A protein has these predicted regions:
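Conserved "landmark" site that anchors the functional core of diverse proteins
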Residues: 1-440
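Short, flexible surface segments
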Residues: 55, 303, 355, 471, ...
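Short beta-turn/strand-loop junction motif enriched in small, turn-promoting residues
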Residues: 312-316, 470, 489
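Short histidine-centered loop motifs in beta-beta connectors
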Residues: 46, 51, 345-346, 465-474, ...
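Generic structural signal for buried aliphatic residues
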Residues: 59-60, 307, 359-360, 464, ...
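A generic structural motif
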Residues: 17, 331, 468, 485-490, ...
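Short hydrophobic beta/alpha edge segments that flank linear recognition/processing sites
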Residues: 56, 473-494, 513-526
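Acidic, low-complexity mobile loops and tails
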Residues: 438-482, 492, 498
Length: 526
């Protein structure tokens, strides 16, 4: 329902990522890929500035050309090598630079999908295939291309490639411009893609990995409660994400949601979707593809290994952090911090899953899951896996044989989706608080202060977790006035001196911006 949602693709370091109405800049500790649109990327030479930012700072973006980015990189490297003085000034804004991110387009021809290549900052290019739809054939084409490029790397014919990350219908190539120029890389990509064999008869290895799932786990319920208390109490997906999934998909009961989740084989299309080997997967059978919108605004906290659905995709969160997928439960670890490298074990690498694995869930109680989670990283729980393969020819036959029932399911689903949209509009839930609403009480707003009045502002953006005082109350220096929750941390807002609380300017559970005025104190001496 939100225009920021896209089919998951890779994220560049420095990408400006619009997660619903909340933009963030992704650093080197950010996710490998995700399902939100990224309209721009901070160039490599300017990434150091992200580490200098603090709550309350204002960020202004300047548009640079690729040539300017290269010049800036050279100037910064020279300054660091000599340490002779301050870093050179940032190049001036180039209004004509990169009016479009598209650097190459190849239209569809016969059985070959269209390809678009986009610039992503100065060190990445993103190749996208076909229309904006979920199509497993497009993912297979991405796989064939990545395999061909890796072969060129192994033969020493493609220097300067740092990494490649596949998405649902895309491949992001991270390169070092000191070793291979963007235009030279583009020529290799175009030639390699043009020479790809057809995927018609493609068969890829596909294990079935059986994972325990604690349905509607208490930790996911806690995350929903925290969200309702501190972010958005009236969100349509609260208080039950599972009920929301049922409603928006036109299912008759929560048991139908349960049945689909536990019967569907989920094909892993990407890894690192929200950190640490986390899979993004979708059911092979379109009749089992539950579709949801994501949280807006996003959650500030998600339990490790929570299982959720966003768009048509399922994700297992690799670690605690923000998130937006609708919860169905919780499973075991996707990433092993303690034990890996054993040949033949499920953790030959730190990450558990592989591309094109098929996940099958089986139900366990919350207590069983806690025991499994305690034992699994240390080799104390045997995970059941079965070797197999995925054949595109067989899959096409399955889709053709079931075309009528698939179309009927999608039609019912679409009717329910539109009905949900209308409910939101009727209830006034289609829009959340705008930036203007937050800025209304910002540092530049006009407020009539009484004599001796003092404005108290929060230095961090977040949500008002607790209002500890009331109007007219006497406070002493150091008393807690409010508790602000920001990115999983709680910040106490303290009284600077003995005073009386004159006016509260925000409510418990509301959102606040860095620098926003939240209450007025009258100093005791007045």
């Amino acid at each position: 329902l939100h225009p920021s949602n896209i089919h998951d693709n890779a994220y560049a370091i420095g990408a400006i990522d619009f997660t619903g109405d909340m933009p963030v800049i992704l650093g080197p500790d950010g996710p490998s890929l995700g399902g939100f649109v990224c309209p721009a990327v901070v160039v490599n030479a300017e990434l150091w500035k992200l580490g200098q930012l603090r709550p309350g700072d204002t960020v202004r973006f300047h548009r640079l050309s690729l040539a300017q980015a290269g010049e800036r990189e050279a100037a910064v490297e020279a300054a660091l090598s000599s340490l002779a003085g301050a870093l050179p000034a940032t190049p001036s804004d180039d209004a004509d630079a990169h009016t479009t991110p598209v650097i190459y387009e190849d239209p569809a021809r016969e059985d070959v999908p269209a390809m678009v290549v986009r610039q992503a900052g100065d060190r990445y290019v993103l190749l996208e295939f076909g229309p904006l739809v979920l199509d497993i054939e497009l993912r297979l084409r991405v796989h064939v291309l990545m395999t061909a490029l890796k072969d060129l790397q192994a033969q020493g014919q493609l220097p300067g490639i740092i990494d490649m990350t596949p998405g649902i219908r895309s491949l992001q190539v991270h390169f070092d411009p000191a070793l291979i120029a963007r235009d030279a890389l583009l020529k290799v990509l175009i030639a390699t893609e043009a020479a790809l064999p057809p995927v018609d008869d493609m068969v890829v290895p596909s294990r079935t990995v059986h994972l325990p799932l604690s349905w509607d786990d208490p930790q996911t319920k806690l995350a929903i409660e925290k969200y309702m208390q501190s972010v958005r109490p009236d969100a349509p997906w609260c208080p039950s994400n599972i009920e929301f999934i049922r409603r928006i998909n036109g299912l008759d009961s929560i048991h139908e949601v349960f049945k689909i989740v536990f019967e569907a084989p989920y094909l892993v299309l990407g890894l690192g979707d929200v950190y640490l080997g986390a899979p993004v997967a979708t059911p092979l059978d379109p009749r089992q593809r539950l579709v949801t919108t994501k949280y807006n605004p996003a959650r500030t906290w998600t339990p490790e290994n929570a299982v959720g659905i966003g768009g048509a995709y399922l994700c297992v969160y690799g670690m605690e952090g923000p998130g937006g997928y609708q919860f169905v439960g919780r499973t075991l670890q996707m990433w092993n911090r303690w034990r890996h490298g054993e040949a033949g074990s499920v953790f030959e690498q730190p990450w558990l899953l592989r591309f094109f694995d098929q996940i099958r869930f089986y139900p366990v109680s919350q207590d069983e899951l806690l025991r499994i989670r305690a034992d699994f990283p240390h080799g104390g729980y045997a995970l059941r896996t079965e070797e197999g393969s995925f054949s595109l020819k067989d899959y096409r036959r399955f889709l053709a044989d079931n075309a009528a029932s698939i179309a009927a399911f999608k039609a019912t689903q679409q009717v329910a989706f539109e009905a949900e949209r209308e409910r939101w509009a009727a209830a006034g839930l289609a829009e959340v608080a705008s930036e203007a609403d937050v800025e209304a009480a910002g540092p530049d707003s006009e407020i009539d202060l009484p004599e001796g009045g003092r404005l108290i502002a929060t230095s961090v953006p977040g949500n008002v977790w607790k209002v500890a005082v009331s109007e007219g109350q006497q406070v002493q220096a150091g008393d807690v006035l409010m508790v602000i929750e920001s990115m999983k941390m709680e910040f106490n807002l303290l009284a600077p001196a003995s005073a009386t609380v004159h006016k509260l300017m925000c409510a418990q559970g509301g959102s606040v911006a860095a620098g926003q005025n939240v209450l007025v104190l009258i100093d005791e001496a007045v």
